[in-house]
């Protein structure tokens, strides 16, 4: 090199540190189940077994990152290498600097700079690409020497508001709107669930031979008990904004008990009271079993077997099992029933996006709007004489009609006219529902055993509703103890329903999840105010009389939609699992198929094609106890087995539980429910505020670990 050449400048320092990868949002399965794994790029590291937020810790960095959506494993980018020194460092700094490590793993410890502990994008401290440090040899490499940022935690109120905004909810679980919004949204919430509250008694009371006045009394009792049990559940149960009422889960066993052989020969005006007392006794025993299941902590063990793949076919089978009841009864008056079905479909589907003052009135009020329009049209047809035939009286029983001309039109007059019911005119203005109003309950062990099994199915249905609604309105899913506490309280409230004589148990209505998602209203106070209004309405006898006057054809038409909705809500639980997995598809398909095929075998066994049964065709699936294939020397056992195995929901539950818990599958594939744990409740005030008992009642039950937070 010549002397005229310029001297080379100082060598440039190492490359600047590469920016950390942007935080990846949780995968769809993680969002839907509340699962937060310790994978790279996710900002909230969790324990995969419990799904809870963990404190920032320094651990070894993983080399690969599982892809929850694609089920693949992809390589992590190499960790950043920070600058060792700057170009302007002094000789003193160079002397104090330790010798550099081998190429490819340069990292300089920083002693003079205070480094705050922070969580990496995956919550751990990494090492260079190799199992033992630098390409597989040497000691683990230190993190780059630069001033780290601390993890900022939002205040609790800001965190709650953020959750509510992310979920697009108008009001969260603990929000208290003004009095006017509470009243409006409370009325909206209960009107949207009108069908679920009143349709069950309109089915079972006529099946028991009850009069129009008795139908009105049972409807008022259902409103009263639903209001009381909802207040109890929002205060001492799960504390989620879930309405309690007569669940469709109890409808099939109630109809099976009503059509038992020992009740077929009853005559007189006391048929209704006698059958109701038998039904009350069975509900009380079955509900007491459910209460023991919850408060003893056994429900926490059952939760290990209950997953979305189990809940989906079980709940769906409840709605599908009533296919023989729906349209056969609608066919008694097609011009009224079909119009009712078409209107509710148009409102719920075709007009669902039409908003008035930011409220989707057609979607929210699909059932009451379609009922009001159809009822008004049927009233006009009745008043104009469309269903009036000369010399025929619709109030005369068919057995007393002599004229052949009138016999031909009696069915049409009975189901199409709207003035055949005198429930409204005969109902008193004030009536207080009281316990044991139908008499002392009668206890029969075989009917009680059937209800005990049904209470387990009702608990499974409620578990799915708890999880789905908590993801909408709460900061986290409840703990297993809270779920057990809620199931225990549902058993207690169903005992109250049995004492008051509603004909069914009082459990969480599955339609709650749909209503909360549509109305965007998750406030607990709204549901509580609506429950108080429901209790007040139940004391006005004319309200029960008005609801009891709904024609049977319209009831069947609404039930066609409600049972279809119930089936859809059950199948929607599959969104928490891998719905495209062949494992889950086969399990759900087998469960649904056999839930329809096996009961059909039991229901058709021993019935000749030419047999003339005394019960209507839509009640024939519930008389299987008298002719089922299970025959032994114990008549009570025959009744229990034939009745249970003729219920679709029981077969679906048995099939799904066995297959889901024996066929291998990952937690992600199965969509295992992720519940919060007690340790998280102590760290996060939001979780405790969401689920802790009011008035500091929980401090007296801290020793009961299995039913608390």
Swiss-Prot record:
Protein name according to UniProt: Nucleobase-ascorbate transporter 12
* A molecular-function term among this protein's GO annotations: adenine transmembrane transporter activity
Which residue ranges are recorded for the region named Disordered?
Answer: 1-145
**What family, per the record?**
Belongs to the nucleobase:cation symporter-2 (NCS2) (TC 2.A.40) family.
Tissue specificity here reads: Ubiquitous.
Q: What are the record's GO terms for cellular component? A: plasma membrane
Alphabetical UniProt keywords: Cell membrane, Membrane, Phosphoprotein, Transmembrane, Transmembrane helix, Transport
Q: Which residues carry this modification: Phosphoserine?
A: 40
Taxonomy, superkingdom:
Eukaryota
Cystine pairings recorded for this chain: none
Q: Name one GO biological process term.
A: uracil import across plasma membrane
Pfam (any one)? Xan_ur_permease
What is the organism field in this record? Arabidopsis thaliana
PANTHER family with a match to the protein in the record: XANTHINE-URACIL / VITAMIN C PERMEASE FAMILY MEMBER
> Topology relative to the membrane, per the entry?
Multi-pass membrane protein
Q: Where is the composition biased (Pro residues)?
A: 7-19
* Regions of compositional bias (Basic and acidic residues) in chain numbering: 89-98, 113-122
Segments passing through the bilayer:
190-210, 218-238, 240-260, 283-303, 308-328, 329-349, 361-381, 438-458, 530-550, 551-571, 585-605, 639-659
Q: Where is the composition biased (Polar residues)?
A: 41-53
Compartment(s) of residence: Cell membrane
